[in-house]
Amino acid sequence: LGDVPGTSGAVFVARPESKSPDRFGLFGAPPLEEGYVILVGDENLKQFPPPSKFLPSVWNRSRAARLVCCSIVLCCLCLAVFLYWSENMGQTVTTPLSLTLDHWKDVERTAHNQSVDVKKRRWVTFCSVEWPTFNVGWPQDGTFNRDIITQVKIKVFSPGPHGHPDQVPYIVTWEALAFDPPPWVKPFVHPKPPLPPSAPSLLPEPPLSTSPRSSLYPALTPSLGAKPKPQVLPDSGGPLIDLLTEDPPPYRDPGPPPSDRDRDDGEAAPAGEAPDPSPMASRLRGRRELPVADSTTSQAFPLRSGGNGQLQYWPFSSSDLYNWKNNNPSFSEDPGKLTALIESVLLTHQPTWDDCQQLLGTLLTGEEKQRVLLEARKAVRGEDGRPTQLPNEINDAFPLERPDWDYNTQRGRNHLVLYRQLLLAGLQNAGRSPTNLAKVKGITQGPNESPSAFLERLKEAYRRYTPYDPEDPGQETNVSMSFIWQSAPDIGRKLERLEDLKSKTLGDLVREAEKIFNKRETPEEREERIKRETEEKEERRRAEDEQKEKERDRRRHREMSKLLATVVSGQKQDRQGGERRRPQLDKDQCAYCKEKGHWAKDCPKKPRGPRGPRPQTSLLALDD
């Protein structure tokens, strides 16, 4: 080692073998110090720790050691991942919200059956963010508890600024999933309690329906605990309860809870029982048995009197409100049609003040509702029968705040009737647009439109764009003239030629127009007539062409005959008098006497008339 730099003067010191049998190298290898020598200098000779203390040296020297270490690390990593996965999978819970998202196609199909459309993002937002803030027990993961769903629906259908019309399709769909659950929802719906034997069935079991009916009543699903006794409402002098925030009033004595199906179908009490008195009076419904109706029928029936003459309240169903809104144009687009709908609802259903606000809030926008209420308050009349400006009379007849009217008294019902009349007047006045006669003139009869339908459109245009009432006898002449001038061309021409047109009423004109309209040819007859007229026109044109051709040939023949006759006669004359042709005359030769020096007109030999001969005119020569 003398050639190695830095090792000059070094000596080799042998280390003794270790006699301890329990000292081994890594993975059973013999100790590294056996037969190993340390190079030390002679200047600082001292003891160093053996190399076996430095295990990384084995990692660099042994491939098997590296393979074993990598296998151990990989096994530990796989074990940790397996334990973490097992722990998390064991904690995964299926919630109603995740269940509906997994079966979203079925949810959309259910919404389509309810005549609504739902979006997945808004579905998640309403379920996890909006509805838990209603404080009715709705969890963020959703629920199929019918009681909680009904409470949420009451909040959604609240009138005024507290309602949420944009959430109606979603809560209606969720309610349909709970009340008519598909197979994947049934395990999560609480089973209905069996009907006790002591409770007789009030109505026969209706057939199963694919479209569940909705109601604004809270679900009365009996709880597992003791059911508290229903509270009987005070006498009719007490204040009205809020149907959208309070429980519905009881109508019969507490008894065994009926089934959900019986409650949804609106069953009547047994014959021997009478409903408890209640101050809630509005639309009347009989408590007697009703025929089983299809599930798609309306739940808001006209008012009826009960067995004891007591008025009973039933609110509008959500399906009625939503169908009215979707199946009719907006108030701004067609105020007449929506006004007619609300008028029929006011007459047949006799809604309360709260119901009127709910109806207006559903069918009208905020601006339209304010305009209707303003026009209705303008229509309030005083004692003299003219519109009044007194605030107390206006607020008494058409209040903006909820009035304290007792619907079981005649005075309360009179207030309600007057309120409906004023509301209808407000709808009619608010639906009128500024006067625009051009709009009325632009209403014309369609090609296949009947005169009656055209007259209805014309009258609607008069109501909407003019301040005139088309039903007023004083406006009948204007409406009649518009009907004649704006009818279909064939009908208008025949109406204008009617005898004694001035004495005809609008009804007479409509009947005459109906006769003309009904005598119109069918499309097949019109096509056949056009075909026949085309053939006749073609035949006439062909005959005219033939006649013109014949006339042209005749004229050509006549001209040719004249030409030939002229040529033949000229040739004949040339042959007969060819030799007797007169000789050529000179320039100064007379054609009469053949002498030169003058012309025939100045010939002295030519006999003259009684005027005597003309003086001879001399021809001057150049030399003269």
Swiss-Prot record:
Sorted alphabetically, which SUPFAM superfamilies does this protein's record hold? Answer: Retroviral matrix proteins (SSF47836), Retrovirus capsid protein, N-terminal core domain (SSF47943), Retrovirus zinc finger-like domains (SSF57756)
Q: Which residue spans traverse the membrane? A: 64-86
Q: Which residues lie on this side of the membrane: Extracellular?
A: 87-624
Q: Where is this region: Disordered?
A: 200-284, 290-309, 520-624
Q: Which Pfam families match?
A: Gag_MA (PF01140), Gag_p12 (PF01141), Gag_p30 (PF02093), zf-CCHC (PF00098)
Membrane association type: Single-pass membrane protein
> Ranges of Basic and acidic residues compositional bias?
520-552, 572-605
- Composition bias of kind Pro residues appears in 200-209, 247-258
Localization terms from the record = Host cell membrane
Major location, coarse class?
A: host cell
Q: Does the keyword Glycoprotein apply?
A: yes
UniProt modification remark:
Glycosylated by host.
Give glycosylation sites per the record. 113, 478
Q: What's in the keyword line of the UniProt record?
A: Glycoprotein, Host cell membrane, Host membrane, Membrane, Transmembrane, Transmembrane helix
Q: What does this protein do?
A: Plays a role in viral particle release. Presumably acts by facilitating the fission of the virion bud at the cell surface. May prevent the antiviral activity of murine APOBEC3.
Q: What is this protein called?
A: Glyco-Gag protein
Species: Cas-Br-E murine leukemia virus
- Upper classification of the organism: Viruses, Riboviria, Pararnavirae, Artverviricota, Revtraviricetes
